[in-house]
């Protein structure tokens, strides 16, 4: 599986989330298959976005697009870090 891990700070989580949700269709059309949103334990505006993509090339193209740069600015995203990952292994433990 192909993953993108994004770590960034936002000015206001509620505003960011509203804009993030409004971009669902364009993310899906670009190749995002699923996502999870996390926050740092004691920093509510420090966001981690982990998503599964159909390909890392599509993800890179999407995240570097001028349209998304504008969306990030509107959403108050500060200094995003993008990490492109290929899954090697998954493990589960029986309980």
Please place each PLM-identified region on the residue numbering:
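Short amphipathic alpha-helical segments
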Residues: 12-36, 67-70
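Generic structural motif
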Residues: 11-13, 56, 87-88
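Short, well-ordered beta-strand segments in beta-rich or mixed alpha/beta enzyme
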Residues: 2-9, 36-65
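Compositionally biased, low-structure terminal segments
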Residues: 21, 63-64, 83, 93
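Glycine-rich beta-strand-turn "strand-cap" elements at beta-sheet edges
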Residues: 2, 30-48, 70-95
């Amino acid at each position: 599986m192909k993953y993108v891990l994004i770590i960034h700070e936002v000015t206001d989580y509620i505003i960011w989330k509203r804009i993030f949700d409004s971009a669902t269709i364009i993310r899906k059309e670009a190749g995002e298959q699923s996502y999870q949103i996390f926050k740092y334990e004691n920093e509510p505006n420090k966001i981690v976005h982990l998503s599964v993509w159909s390909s890392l090339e599509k993800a890179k193209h999407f995240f570097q697009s001028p349209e998304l740069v504008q969306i990030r600015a509107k959403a108050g995203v500060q200094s995003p870090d993008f990490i492109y990952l290929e899954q090697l292994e998954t493990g589960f433990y029986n309980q």
